[in-house]
Swiss-Prot record:
Reported tissue expression: Expressed in some neurons in head and tail, some motoneurons in ventral nerve cord, in PVP interneurons, seam cells, rectal gland cells, vulva cells and some non-neuronal cells in the tail. Expressed in D-type motor neurons.
Any GO BP annotation: positive regulation of axon regeneration
Protein name: Discoidin domain-containing receptor tyrosine kinase B
Entry keyword set: ATP-binding, Cell membrane, Cell projection, Disulfide bond, Glycoprotein, Kinase, Membrane, Neurogenesis, Nucleotide-binding, Receptor, Repeat, Signal, Transferase, Transmembrane, Transmembrane helix, Tyrosine-protein kinase
Disulfide bonds: 25-181
Gene: ddr-2
EC number from the UniProt entry: 2.7.10.1
Residue spans, topological domain Extracellular: 20-384
Effect noted on mutating residue 554 to E: Abolishes kinase activity and abolishes autophosphorylation. Does not rescue the axon regeneration defect in the svh-4 loss of function mutant (ok564) following injury to D-type motor neurons
Source species of the chain: Caenorhabditis elegans
Stated family: Belongs to the protein kinase superfamily. Tyr protein kinase family. Insulin receptor subfamily.
């Protein structure tokens, strides 16, 4: 029975990603606000414990004589330290220091310091090193002002020591604050061979904090491969975040990861380079072994082959799928690419969740793939009777599980944070512009990558500003009021209750707080306006510069309190969506009016305009675009979000050729001819709408699939005409009414010339099935499109 309970837990426990997540790990840890208690602060010595003891080392606070002052003067070899102890392992991302001001009487400050840290898994204190392998960190130039230093890599510590140093002997006093967050992951350490040197450049894992001992093998610590930082392009120049190995005699690199608890692992993600022109390809294959105790490894081994990519040299995440393996230790062997002299890795993450070990006895064998049960026969037959009961209970539970999974297929709850993007990219060039092929296993899961959400513009904005449509993703729950949107539909519906299903008031009304997120508050003076992009549903949309990136800024002003509430709900819902093929909300400005929503800027504008400006686009590019959109829509599907207005005009293209799902209030004015005006009140995209959405007001992921079928037709038609271009709006409505009454359309969109017959018949046509349950899921559409990416040059028409 415990094994059954265990199986239940494995089946329904959502996967999380074991990774060092730094985007929201910069909180003040409590020196200034006294969340860190006096008893958690200690020091090697104090000039006077009462007036300059460690309890006075709080930044932005004046107590005692104003700071901690060690008993001895400081030089470059000093060993004085201030120690902060935490109750749990903690991620430290930055340190702030001040001197002793003491209302102007102080004269002492530290010009530099070092960091030492410890946690229970380490045998000794470790020293922090920056990207240049230096331990010394610059500190203060006066006694009053605080200086905050961001660490080049985060450290994981239970105790941290601030060690003041100086080139000349001097008296020093310090106040400090530390920033970071609790360490919630379960990785204890990883073991790996030390990296190699190339022409004096080190590709060592120099931040590794375990047992070094001048050995070529690193054990018992954590370093670059688990610091939340991924490497940049051109590993031979931007080498600081990479660990690199030359091809050895055996041609592989071995890694071992140990967790503090049993984990149910479903995937391993490895960030690797692929600079094949410099003989630094991604790994060609991988082998993974698992153990529940670190000693005995399962005979069931995971083998993974990574297809060689000779098109793109961009670093990428590669996902190794693992079929729910229970393990405390995972050993990974990566084989060098063909004719590759180097292998570079910058980060390793795990898709996994906690396994409740209390359900497992020592004598319960956790199955690798097939479980074998044996029963010892007793004279009284009791054991056989128990076995029969157990067997039938197992069958009943299995049927229940399968039934629930089937029912949850269409009505999934909002997914947990998806895993980092495991995409492969194949660059396709169209008259100097670039679109990316994305080929990724289980892309619908991979929202977190995004991983660093890098949104830096790489191409100048088109001079035709009307081509840019405001990102405003319209999403809505399946649970909608089934009210017809047109007059003349039978049923007891109050016509006064008809409302625009594309408005923010309606489309976000079904989302409770569970779907919302708290977005970063961005200082208004950080935004430098570049130009006006256009007009959105709530106000103007401007192109602005935010530090080193360009962003699209939506303004809200001069509207009702209800619209302001809708705007707040919209941006909070949108902020919860994180996927490489969904336009991202960067932050908000809400402290002053007008309220601003800062969104990712997509410099190549909407997909329809982009395709129209590139008439030489080929079938392979069309398949790539559809694959990317299907990935984003599969993610929305997994979150149970409904878009309601999927069309080429509502997708955007960034400077690198990434195509992303969006929905623009502005698109309805840019492409007003593609919308049908209902009673002079609102407009509907009837040529993209499923029959049940238009006639019954039923919006679901299945109605989105219908719209995506029309969108694929658009893409393969090169957006040269609108759907059903030979029909009036009334004819289109009549066509959908025909499906409602007869189960079939009078007229179906014909296969575009550039669309392969197989794709049209097997992927596009099924999107327009009368029964929504017979339409494919976005997950299945995405998987089928991915399979075509590899064969697109050989597709027959």
């Amino acid at each position: 029975m415990k094994l059954l309970l265990y199986l239940f837990g494995v089946t329904f426990h959502s996967n999380t990603v074991v990774a060092l997540e730094l985007r929201e790990c910069s909180h003040q840890l409590g020196m200034s606000n006294r969340k860190i208690r006096d008893e958690q602060i200690s020091a090697s010595s104090s000039f006077d414990l009462q007036s300059t003891g460690p309890q006075h080392a709080r930044a932005h606070q004046e107590s005692g004589s104003g700071a901690w002052c060690p008993k001895n003067q400081i030089n470059s070899l000093s060993k004085e330290w201030l120690q902060i102890s935490f109750s749990v392992d903690t991620v430290i991302t930055s340190v702030e220091t001040q001197g002793r001001f003491d209302d102007g009487r102080g004269m002492e400050y530290a010009t530099a310091f070092k960091i030492q840290y410890w946690r229970p898994s380490l045998n000794a204190w470790a020293s922090y090193k920056d990207d240049f392998e230096l331990e010394t960190i610059p500190a203060n130039n006066d006694t009053e002002h605080a200086i905050r230093r961001h660490l080049d890599r985060a450290i994981i510590a239970r105790r941290i020591r601030i060690v003041p140093v100086s080139n000349s002997t001097r008296t020093v006093c310090m106040r400090v604050e530390v920033f970071g967050c609790p360490f919630d992951d379960s990785l204890v350490f990883y073991n790996v061979d030390q990296g190699d040197l190339q022409s004096g450049i080190s590709y060592h894992d120099f931040s590794y904090d375990g047992n070094l001992a001048n050995s070529p093998h690193l054990t018992g610590g954590i370093g670059k491969l688990y610091d939340g930082e991924v490497g940049k392009n051109n590993v031979f120049v931007n080498h600081h975040k990479w660990v690199g190995w030359r091809r050895k005699r055996n041609g592989n690199v071995k890694l071992a990861f140990e967790f503090s608890e049993l984990r149910n692992i479903s995937g391993i993600l490895i960030h690797t380079s692929n600079e094949f022109k410099k003989s630094a390809k991604a790994f060609s294959s991988a082998t993974v072994l698992f153990s529940i105790n670190g000693k005995d490894f399962s005979d069931t081994i995971v083998h993974f082959n990574n297809p060689e990519d000779t098109e793109s040299e961009v670093p990428r995440w590669i996902r190794i799928p693992v079929n729910n393996r229970i393990a405390k230790v995972a050993k990974i062997r990566l084989n060098f690419g063909t004719d590759s002299d180097w292998l570079f890795i910058s980060e390793v993450n795990f898709e996994s969740n906690h396994t409740n070990i209390e359900l497992l006895n020592d004598d319960v064998v956790i199955p690798d793939s097939v479980s074998y049960f044996s029963v010892t026969e007793h004279d009284d037959g009791t054991s056989m009777f128990a076995f029969i009961i157990f067997f039938f209970m197992f069958l009943i539970v299995a049927v229940i599980i399968l039934t629930v999974l089937y029912r949850k297929r269409e009505y999934r709850v909002k997914a947990s944070s998806p895993s980092p993007n495991a995409k492969r990219e194949i660059l396709l060039t169209i008259d100097g512009n670039t679109i990316k092929h994305h080929v990724s296993p289980s892309t619908y899961q991979m929202a977190r990558d995004n991983l660093q959400n890098a949104l830096i513009e790489k191409m100048p904005m088109s001079p035709i500003i009307s081509d840019y449509a405001e990102p405003d993703i319209s999403v809505c729950s399946d649970v909608t009021a089934n009210t017809p949107l047109l007059y003349g539909i039978d049923g007891p519906y109050d016509t006064q209750k008809r409302s625009n299903p594309l408005s923010s008031m309606v489309k976000y009304s079904d989302y409770g707080e569970v779907y919302c997120t708290t977005l970063p508050e961005i200082a208004r003076d950080k935004l430098i306006c570049v130009s006006r992009i256009g007009q959105g549903e709530f106000g103007e949309v401007d192109l602005c510069q935010l530090e080193n990136r360009k962003v699209a800024v939506k303004k809200l002003h001069g509207i009702s309190q209800a619209d302001e509430f809708s705007f707040h709900r919209e941006i909070r819902v949108l902020g919860s969506l994180k996927h490489p093929n969904v336009v991202e909300v960067v932050g908000v400005c809400t402290i002053q009016k007008p309220i601003l929503c800062i969104m990712e800027y997509m410099e190549n504008g909407d997909l329809k305009s982009y395709i129209l400006k590139n008439p030489t686009i080929q079938t392979s590019q069309c398949i790539s675009i559809c694959t990317q959109l299907a990935a984003g829509l599969a993610y929305l599907e997994s979150c149970n979000f409904v878009h309601r207005d999927i069309a080429a005009r509502n997708c955007l293209v960034d400077g690198e050729g990434n195509v992303k799902i969006a929905d623009f209030g502005m698109a309805r004015s840019l492409y007003s001819q593609e919308y049908y005006k209902v009673e002079g009140k609102f407009v509907l995209p009837i040529r993209w709408m499923a029959w049940e959405a238009l006639l019954l007001g039923k919006f679901s992921t299945a109605s989105d699939v219908w719209g995506f079928g029309v969108t694929m037709w658009e893409i393969f038609s090169l957006c040269s005409e609108k759907p059903y271009s030979d029909m009036t709006d009334d004819d289109v409505v009549e066509n959908l009414q025909s499906m409602s009454s007869t189960g079939s359309l009078k007229q179906v969109l014909s296969r575009p010339r550039m669309c392969p017959s197989k794709l049209y018949n097997e992927q596009i046509l099924p999107c327009w099935n009368y029964e929504s349950s017979r339409r494919p899921s976005f997950e299945n559409v995405h998987l089928h499109l991915q399979s075509l990416v590899h064969t697109s040059p050989h597709i027959h028409f």
